A protein has these predicted regions:
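A short acidic-Thr-Gly-centered motif at the start of a beta-strand
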Residues: 55-60, 120-123, 425-441, 652-656
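Conserved "right-hand" nucleotidyltransferase catalytic core of DNA-directed polymerases
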Residues: 59-75, 93-95, 181, 188-426, ...
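Conserved catalytic palm subdomain of right-hand nucleotidyl-transferase polymerases, strongest
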Residues: 64-65, 132, 152-155, 434-450
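Active-site-proximal helix-loop-helix substrate-binding element of RNase H-like nuclease domains
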Residues: 86-240, 398, 472, 478-483, ...
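Short active-site loop/helix that positions an aromatic residue
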Residues: 135-146, 163, 305-308, 448-462
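Active-site palm subdomain of RNA-directed nucleic acid polymerases
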Residues: 239-251, 646-659
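Generic long, charged, amphipathic alpha-helical segments
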Residues: 478-492, 610-644, 648-658
Length: 659
C-alpha cells in the first residue's frame, strides 16, 4: 500500500491524551528507522505520515517559514520582544514552502494579501511550523493577530545546536555545505529596508527606505528571503534522522513560556542607580583631578605617567590585581593611595546592567527573551541574553533594603557615609532590581555543588557520595583525605581547607598544574611543586574519578575507531559513532553530538600522541575549528549535561506545580 495517498481518518483536535502519546512514540520510531511495526504487519512510514493504530492514520505536514520585518527598535540592544512590540513594527515579506513544494513569497510591504493556503497551514494544528530561531516568527505573527501555540513551532536553530552545530543560519549553512546556502547579501539589505535611515538631502529627508525607493534591491531582498526558507528546509531534512527526545521538546516549550512571561524590573531603582552613578563618577573624577591635575583621571595612560613621576618608579599597569599591590607598596604616600583607591572605585562603577534593563523593558516593565535555549553546544545549557542573568553580582550586605532605599531616593551622600564605596553598592543592588509582582514572592533556587555530586555519582566514588548524603562538606572531607588529618583540623578559614577547595574546583576533570593556577593556586602562595603535590594527593584520594576519565576516553576511542555502539561502564552511558557524529547518550535519553570525529596526531609532552578531535566552536576564538578532546574533557561535558538535565527536569516539575 502506498500510504502517501491515504487521507487522515481523524483530525488531531479529536485526539485523546493516549492518542498523542501513541503518535509521539510512533513518530520517534519512524524518524529513527523509517518503519513502524503494527500488530501483524510492517508498514513503511515516510515523514510526515504516522499511524496511530492499524486503522487510523494522521498526516502531519511541514511548513517552512521565514520573514523580513521592520522596526525602529534596535533588536541587538533591546531584544526581539521589544523590537516586535514597537508601534511601527511590521512584517514586510513572508516566504514559505509546504513539505517539498516550491517557495512562495508574499510581498506584504507592497500590498499583496495574505495567501489563503498560508493562513490555512498556519492555523492547522496538523502542520508543523518550522523556522530558524522560530521564536521570532512566532512572536511576529502573534503581533499581527496570528497567535499560533508554541507547541506547533519547530526551531531549526535549536535542532542545529542539538546536533553540535552553530546557532546562526549562515554558519549552519556553511558547516553543512548546503545546496541552498543563506545568501551573503542579507546584512546590507536588512540595514537598508528593515532599519531606520538617517534623513539626508539625497534621500529627500526620509527616515525609512521603502520598496519603491530601490526596486532592484527589494527584489534582491525577496530572493534573500526565499533562500533562507530553502536553507532551513534543507537543514531540517539533513538532520531529520537525529531526533530530539520528547523531554527536550517539553523543555523547549517551557523555555518559550518562561521567556514569554519575562521578569519584572524595578524601573525606579534602575533609573535612580544610573543617575546616582553619573553624579558619583563626577565626584570621584573631581576628587582625583584635584590631586593629580589630569584632564582625564580615569585614563590608564595618563594615570600611569602621573604615578611614575610621583613615585619615581615606572608604573605600566593598573590592572585590577595590580592596584592593591601598588597601594601596599606606596602606603606612606597619601596622594598616591587616594588616587589609586579612587581608581578602584571608578573601575568598579558599572551600571551596564541597569542600562540593559531600561533598554529591554517593555511597556509592562518586564524584560523578555533573557534565556537562549541550548545556547551551549553539546551540554545544552542555557545561555544568557540581554541581561546575562546567570552572571549577576552577588550581594553580601545583610540588610540590603537600607542601601536599596537610599539609592531609590538618590541619596548617594548618605550611602557613601554608611558604606564608603557607592559603586560597589550599585553593583550589589543589580539583583534587587529584578522583582516579583505584587502578591507574589520572587524565589531563587539552585543545586548545591551539583557538578561535584555528579562526578562522584558517575564514578561511583563512594566516600564522596557518603559526604553528600550527610553534611555535604566536601572541602573538609577532601582535605582530611588528601592531607591525612582529622576532619576537625580542616576548618573554614584554614590553610588546609583553602587548598582542598582549590583542588576540588580545579581537578575534577583531569586538570593538573595549569588548572590549579587558573583557580588561583599560585595567588594563594603555592609553588608549582606544591601544587603538583596537591594534584597527586587529590587523585590518590579519588581513584574512581581517575578511572572514570580513562573509562570515558576508552569508550569514546572504541566507538570512533570501530564506528560502533559501546555501552560504557560509567552508569551505562551509550557511546556511538556513525562517521558523521560521535554521540554520548545520557540517562535522560538526550545525546551529546560531536561532529566529524577523527583521530589526529599532536605533540604532547614532547611525544607524538593520537588524540580524538571533532569540529566545533573553539571557546577561545568563538570560531568554527578543530577541537581536541580527552577523557577528562568528555567527563566534564557529560557531568555538566546531566546537571543541566536535572535542572530541566526540576523546572518542568516546578511549572507543573504552579510556580
Amino acid at each position: 500500500m502506498d500510504i502517501r495517498k491515504v487521507k487522515p481518518c481523524i483530525k488531531s483536535s479529536a485526539f485523546t491524551r493516549a492518542d498523542w502519546q501513541t503518535m509521539r512514540k510512533y513518530q520517534a520510531a519512524s524518524e529513527r528507522s523509517g518503519f513502524i511495526l503494527l500488530p501483524g504487519k510492517e508498514v513503511h512510514a515516510r515523514s510526515p505520515l504516522f499511524f496511530l493504530n492499524a486503522n487510523t492514520l494522521i498526516i502531519m505536514q511541514d511548513i517552512y517559514i521565514d520573514i523580513e520585518t521592520y522596526s525602529s527598535v534596535d533588536i541587538k540592544t533591546s531584544g526581539a520582544y521589544k523590537y516586535i512590540e514597537s508601534p511601527d513594527f511590521e512584517i514586510l515579506i513572508i516566504s514559505y514552502a509546504i513539505n517539498d513544494g516550491p517557495v512562495i513569497t508574499i510581498d506584504l510591504a507592497q500590498g499583496e494579501p495574505m495567501a489563503d493556503e498560508f493562513e490555512e497551514a498556519l492555523f492547522d494544528p496538523d502542520f508543523r511550523k518550522h523556522a530558524h530561531n522560530a521564536v521570532f516568527e512566532r512572536l511576529s505573527f502573534r503581533r499581527i493577530g496570528y497567535d499560533i501555540p508554541v507547541e506547533q513551532w519547530y526551531c531549526t536553530s535549536v535542532k542545529a545546536a542539538y546536533c553540535g552545530l552553530p546557532l546562526s543560519l549562515d554558519e549552519v549553512s556553511k558547516r553543512l555545505d548546503l545546496t541552498n546556502k543563506k545568501l551573503d547579501t542579507g546584512k546590507a539589505l536588512i540595514k537598508y529596508f528593515s532599519c531606520p535611515c538617517k534623513p539626508t538631502k539625497i534621500n529627500g529627508g526620509r527616515t525609512r527606505n521603502y520598496p519603491w525607493d530601490a526596486p532592484e534591491k527589494w527584489e534582491m531582498y525577496k530572493e534573500y528571503n526565499v533562500y533562507d526558507v530553502l536553507a532551513e528546509r534543507e537543514i531540517d531534512q539533513l538532520l531529520k534522522q537525529y531526533v530530539i527526545p520528547d523531554f527536550e521538546r517539553q523543555l523547549y516549550i517551557l523555555d518559550q513560556h518562561i521567556n514569554d512571561r519575562g521578569i519584572l524590573v524595578d524601573m525606579e531603582l534602575a533609573n535612580a542607580a544610573i543617575e546616582v552613578d553619573t553624579i558619583y563618577t563626577d565626584v570621584l573624577m573631581e576628587k582625583s583631578r584635584a590631586i593629580n591635575g589630569l584632564e582625564n583621571p580615569n585614563s590608564p595612560v595618563q594615570l600611569c605617567k602621573w604615578l611614575s613621576r610621583k613615585t619615581g618608579d615606572e608604573i605600566t599597569s593598573l590592572a585590577k590585581d595590580q592596584i592593591p599591590l601598588l597601594i601596599s607598596k606606596y602606603s606612606k604616600d597619601k596622594d598616591v593611595v587616594e588616587v589609586l583607591e579612587t581608581r578602584q572605585k571608578l573601575s568598579r562603577s558599572s551600571v551596564k546592567k541597569y542600562y540593559a534593563m531600561i533598554n529591554c523593558a517593555m511597556r509592562d516593565n518586564r524584560v523578555r527573551g533573557t534565556f537562549q535555549f541550548y545556547g551551549a553546544n553539546r551540554t545544552g545549557r542555557w545561555a544568557g541574553r540581554l541581561l546575562q542573568l546567570q552572571n549577576l553580582s552577588k550581594n553580601h550586605l545583610e540588610n540590603i533594603e537600607l542601601p536599596r532605599e537610599l539609592i531609590r531616593a538618590k541619596d548617594w551622600q548618605a550611602c557613601e557615609m554608611m558604606y564608603d564605596d557607592v559603586a560597589d553598592i550599585l553593583s550589589q543592588l543589580v539583583r534587587t532590581a529584578l522583582i516579583a509582582p505584587k502578591g507574589m514572592t520572587f524565589c531563587v533556587a539552585d543545586f548545591s555543588a551539583i557538578e561535584a555530586r555528579e562526578v562522584s555519582w558517575l564514578a561511583n566514588e563512594e566516600w564522596r557520595m557518603d559526604v553528600f548524603r550527610g553534611d555535604g562538606k566536601i572541602y573538609e572531607a577532601a582535605g582530611a583525605r588528601m592531607f591525612n588529618v582529622p576532619i576537625s583540623a580542616v576548618t573554614k578559614g584554614s590553610d588546609l581547607r583553602a587548598k582542598a577547595k582549590n583542588a576540588e574546583l580545579a581537578l575534577g576533570y583531569q586538570g593538573s598544574l595549569g588548572a590549579m593556577k587558573r583557580m588561583g593556586g599560585d595567588k594563594m602562595g603555592m609553588s608549582d611543586t606544591e601544587m603538583m603535590d596537591i594534584v597527586r594527593k587529590w587523585r590518590k584520594a579519588n581513584p574512581r574519578i581517575v578511572e572514570l576519565w580513562q573509562e570515558v576516553e576508552d569508550c569514546a576511542h572504541e566507538a570512533v575507531r570501530y564506528q560502533r555502539r559501546v555501552v560504557g561502564t560509567p552508569r551505562n552511558l551509550i557511546f556511538d559513532c556513525n562517521g558523521e557524529y560521535f554521540t554520548v547518550t545520557l540517562p535522560s535519553g538526550r545525546s551529546l553530538f560531536y561532529r566529524n570525529p577523527r583521530f589526529v596526531e599532536r605533540v604532547k609532552n614532547k611525544q607524538r600522541v593520537k588524540l580524538l578531535c571533532y569540529d566545533g566552536i573553539v571557546q577561545e576564538t568563538k570560531q568554527w575549528g578543530d577541537i581536541d578532546t580527552y577523557g577528562g574533557k568528555l567527563t566534564e561535558n557529560i557531568v555538566q549535561a546531566i546537571a543541566r538535565d536535572l535542572i530541566g527536569y526540576s523546572m518542568l516539575k516546578l511549572e507543573e506545580a504552579g510556580y
